[in-house]
Amino acid sequence: DKFDVLLANPPFGKDIKVKGEEKLKQFDLAYNWKKEINTFSKTNKLKKEETIQILFIERSLKLLKDGGRLGIVLPETFFHAPKSRYVLHYMLRNNNVTWMLDLPHNTFRPHNNAKCVVIILEKNRPQQDFINMAVAEEIGHDHQGKEIYRWDYIKKETNKTELWDDIPLILEEVES
């Protein structure tokens, strides 16, 4: 069965490896990839191990119907680390990225220190001419997990009834 919508948050805070030929050969991303001009191609050489987060991306895409939507949380470093380029290529080829949401560093703190981005894409659809982008400056809590509230500029005090969380505003935009 395939899904219309899939939301994913791969376990990227830990270095969990998948090993074993039987498991790995199920995944294109468990093979070595060769860089070519403006692209990457899969080789026939299977790796000895791969991180679960990379395989999570591929499995998420395979579980979607054509035209299905994937919302996936990824570490920001994934987008600029040279060793992840082939994975980024795999994820973006033949798919339409509709949104990129930059999350605040405190999003998963105090339990995880990773700075994250959410990608929303449509499977097997041509890339539209633009990608919607949003930056959430606050997520409703600080680095220790304590709630933070919006500042009331008129009263010059903290509004104790409204969490400072930009995500609901961004979700309104995504849904429209």
Spell out what each predicted region is.
Residues D4-S176:
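A conserved structural/catalytic subdomain of Rossmann-like adenosyl-cofactor enzymes
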Residues D1:
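S-adenosyl-L-methionine
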